[in-house]
Amino acid sequence: MSSKEIVNNRERLLVLAACLLITFCMGTVHAFSTLIQNIEMQTNVGRMASSLVYSTALINVTLAVYVGHILYRKFSPQVLIFFIAILPIIGLLISNSESWIGWIIGYGIFFGFSSGLGYGLSLYIVSSVTENEKLGFALGLVTASYAFGAVIFSMLYPFLFDHLGFKDGYICGLLILSSIVFIGLVLFSTSRVKLIQESSTSQQKDFNEVKILKLWLGYFLGVFAGLMIIGHAVPIISSFGGSTSTSITAITLMTLGSGIAGIYAGWLVDRFGCKRPLLTILLINTGAILALSIMTNISLLLILLVLIASLYGAVIAIYPTLVSHIVGSNLSAAVYGRVFTAWGTAGLISPSLAGWLFEKNNNYDASIILTLTISIVAILIIWTMKYSIKD
């Protein structure tokens, strides 16, 4: 008997609310753009060194999701949620040294790992207690909440810094998010839900490496364009003559669009399965990138940037459900941990490669053509993927 069969609706709602609070708070690690200039002034380092703090965080987000299935078996959700709440505070004590290495360890390692653990654990818990016919929407909500956390704290951090200064404002921000995670812990404990797990030996025989490779490549290529556009939105807008305020508005709309699209994509998955919506999203994405390569209007540019970022949000919202459908719920945490490394790899390669191509050509034409080609290959990989829902 699985957890889905013994959990009632009240318990599901409490668990979902807890996981949404956790992912909302852990998504704030991606509000790093509001910290970067203050970190540079505090530590007296340049842009490349300060950017390495966020790169370290991305690596540790990916690592936490990758090893998460081991932690889910060894520790109770309550213990893990406690550590999710406390690790950023430990990191805060280290980053308060006001040194570059302190930020690498405190923010990059401790907060980054906590963020990935919170995201992965929430996906695992929600997929364990949600009926299959509602799984896409539930996981879409979790992914969207992660994005919304970045949006809200991108606005909250500057407010706190203006009124309290950078150091005290950052302390206040982390105390707020840690407190919210503890509220999530209380909600989960109140639900009294017990997660039932199958033995890993009975699961191992169902692994299909070819399927996992296709899932990995589909994810890597599917998010490549979105990560490149998100990472270079400000310089792309600047190259078209856009102002700083235009860039800030675009970034906010892109992140909001990503979250909203994730919710809608989850709703579509519950009605049409994963493959058809995913193919449709990738086709629209390819068309948007093609339009991006030929247009010259700043207003159209903003629309296309928001569209591509929103489609990226839809892809990352669909993928946990896609993995669960293809390999089964018992294997989904372990397999998704492996597949999620595609996101981490794309997150490190895509913006860096786009920056290198820009320096070589002094424009983004080569980067856009590359992402267009990659998006077409992503469509072909998903098209050839055998898809059926496995119980």
Language-model regions, residue ranges each:
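Extracytoplasmic gate region of multi-pass secondary transporters
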Residues: 32-36, 210-265
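Helix-loop-helix hairpin linking two adjacent transmembrane segments in secondary transporters
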Residues: 142-192
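A late C-terminal transmembrane helix in Major Facilitator Superfamily
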Residues: 327-361
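C-terminal transmembrane helical hairpin of 12-TM major facilitator-type secondary transporters
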Residues: 254-258, 269-322
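Intracellular juxtamembrane helix-capping segments at the cytosolic ends
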Residues: 117-130, 314-327
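Helix-to-loop junctions at the C-terminal end of transmembrane segments
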Residues: 64-76, 262-273, 358-359
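Hydrophobic core of transmembrane alpha-helices in multi-pass small-molecule transporters
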Residues: 102-117, 300-314
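C-terminal ends and interior cores of transmembrane alpha-helices
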Residues: 86-99, 284-296
